């Protein structure tokens, strides 16, 4: 193992501990299993293809944060995460928080676009090497299309399983426009993520130029 491998490995081990801790006694085991289909597929793929496609530490950090947020939602079910109580405990009051619907799932849909976008950008840049506007447009379209696919999978799972499990997994909380709002938030998160990636690329380019100039001067 090289020095560069230590950080991704540390994130993997920490996530493994979080996964086990939140998976020991989830509120609804069947919903936890459904919610974690994403993790059961994505994590082995990331580990298997680590050598052939290594993301930046920045992208791995974003993936780690998203997966932790997802595990919290899977532990409680997204519609029952006690986020209001947590914020109230930290800030001492919760009267400024929106009433009614539990918005944790909306927050994670936004986080999905924001935190997965860096890895999607690096994947597309490494495998397809798009140029010009397409270098930035393709990752955004990638995230938006996968958000649509996820909503379709949610709907199909709710149809197949039905009952309380289907309702818990779908998590609409009575909002007929829930899927559309989730997709819109994921798109907004991805757009913000794209802006952050562009800023990071510009900063890295400027830093590389400065190092080159310093080396040339020396």
Positions of PLM-derived features:
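Membrane-interfacial alpha-helical segments at the cytosolic side of multi-pass membrane proteins
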Residues: 41-50, 111-128, 159-163, 184-200
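Membrane-interface loop-to-helix entry segments
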Residues: 31-38, 99-120, 176-188
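Extracytosolic (periplasmic/ER-lumenal) interhelical loops and adjacent juxtamembrane/interface segments
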Residues: 75-107, 156, 160-174
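Interfacial segments of alpha-helical transmembrane regions
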Residues: 44-68, 121-125, 129-146
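N-terminal membrane topogenic signal
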Residues: 1-13
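Alpha-helical transmembrane segments of multi-pass membrane proteins
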Residues: 22, 63-73, 118, 142-154, ...
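Interfacial helix-loop-helix junctions of multi-pass membrane proteins
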Residues: 29-32, 104, 147-187
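Short, hydrophobic transmembrane alpha-helix segments
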Residues: 21-33, 44-54
